[in-house]
A protein has these predicted regions:
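C-terminal beta-sandwich/jelly-roll accessory domains of carbohydrate-active enzymes
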Residues: 89-137
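C-terminal capping/lid segments that line or modulate ligand- or cofactor-binding pockets
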Residues: 1-98, 104-108
Length: 137
C-alpha cells in the first residue's frame, strides 16, 4: 500500500466520524454508502476503542515500537499533506518522548523538519519525513 492510498482511506474514515452533522462513531457502517447501520442504539456511539488512534500513531505518523533501545519511524504521510504535527508525552522504554514535524519551522519555532526528543533533549533530526530507526541516547 502506498502512503497516498493509506492517507486517502484514513481521511475518508475520519470524515465518516459524524452522524447528522455531529461527531459520532458507531459500531457498524455500510462500506458502500457510509450509512450507520446500528441506528441510535446507545451502545453503538461508544465503540471507538483505540483503533483510530493506533492508525494515526502507528501507521500515519509511523511510530513503531521495538524490543531494543530504539523505535522505528515509518510515516505514511504523503509529501505536502501535513505541514506539522506533534506526538508528545510518549511513555516508551522508561523515557518520555516527543516526535515533532514542522515543514516550515514556523509552527513550533524549533526549525524546519523532524525532531525527536527524549526527556526534552533532542536525539534525532531530519529534513524530511523518511523512514528511520531512532536510537534512544
Amino acid at each position: 500500500m502506498t502512503a497516498k492510498v493509506f492517507y486517502d482511506e484514513l481521511h475518508q474514515y475520519a470524515l465518516s466520524h459524524q452522524k447528522n452533522g455531529k461527531p459520532y462513531l458507531g459500531e457498524y457502517q455500510d462500506e458502500k454508502n457510509g450509512e450507520w447501520l446500528k441506528g441510535d442504539n446507545p451502545r453503538s456511539s461508544f465503540y471507538n476503542h483505540s483503533t483510530f488512534c493506533d492508525l494515526v500513531i502507528n501507521d500515519l505518523i509511523g511510530f513503531k515500537p521495538r524490543l531494543d533501545n530504539a523505535f522505528g519511524f515509518y510515516p505514511l504521510i504523503p509529501e505536502g499533506k501535513w505541514d506539522w504535527f506533534v506526538l508528545d508525552n510518549i511513555s516508551y522504554h522508561g523515557r518520555t518522548l516527543k516526535v515533532m514535524w514542522d515543514a516550515t519551522g514556523k509552527k513550533y519555532n524549533k526549525g524546519k523538519g523532524l525532531r525527536v526528543y527524549a526527556e526534552g533533549k533532542e536525539i534525532y533530526r531530519a529534513a524530511n519525513l523518511k523512514p528511520a530507526i531512532i536510537k534512544l541516547k
